[in-house]
Amino acid sequence: AASDVYKRQYLHYVKGYDVAVVDCDYPQHSIAGMRQRDLKLALEDNHYKALAYEQFTRLGKKAYPVVESSTERAIDDADRITEQAAFDLVFFDLPGTVNNPSVIRALSNMDYIIAPISADRVVLESTLRYMTVVNDVIRKTGVSNIKGTYLVWNMVDGREKSELYEVYEQVIAELGLQVLKTFIPDSKRFRRELSAGHRPLFRSTLFPADRSLLRGSNIDALTDEVLTLLNLRDNG
């Protein structure tokens, strides 16, 4: 999810946490694909080369690892990388369907599950079905590590949530699901990646978002809310 990309970016490069990502979303592997695009530009473009050098020398911060994986291998891959280095947080990108036993198995090994939702009825219904299955099949059997499941509003039109969202949130509450207080607004800036034109970037696996674009994005507030839920103290 886009909001996850920004959370990792902010946690690792701004807040000072050590983050790792296991991309199990086969066959898209969108995070692994973004890392490959980022690396290609960073290696070929002098502007990004200098940016990477400055970041490493100033922060002493390498890029967070992105492991291309699958739902079958997800937990083994996570165990392998956490044996090699100490990470504060390991994020998993999982497919948006639970019709596979390996997805259920991987999910049951998560500590927390945070799923993005939008006011698009089809997307919302699909996500709610997903999370209901997670709650019913995994948590109620008692065979899981899950400490909490949460939803986060993504692509919210306008600065304020409308009455429509309140109606949706009533339905969500009736299903026994929790929604985070912070929402992510809909904005074209979120699509800004590394480019040959060196425009201020927002979405990257190698660099933090440009401060001018971060304002009003709610990424900082969302990250702080998640850190509170996870009982992690601020490293920043």
Each model region followed by its residue ranges:
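P-loop/Walker-type NTP enzyme "switch/lid" segment
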Residues: 9-89
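NTP-binding/hydrolysis catalytic cores, primarily Walker-type P-loop NTPases
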Residues: 201-236
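Inter-motif core of Ras-like GTPase G domains
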Residues: 102-121
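Generic structural signal for small/hydrophobic residues in well-ordered secondary structure
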Residues: 30-31, 111, 184
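Beta-strand-loop-alpha "switch" segments that mediate conformational coupling across diverse proteins
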Residues: 155-204
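Short, small-residue-biased leader/transition segments that mark boundaries at the very start
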Residues: 1-6
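Conserved C-terminal guanine-recognition region of P-loop GTPase G domains, centered on the G4
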Residues: 127-140
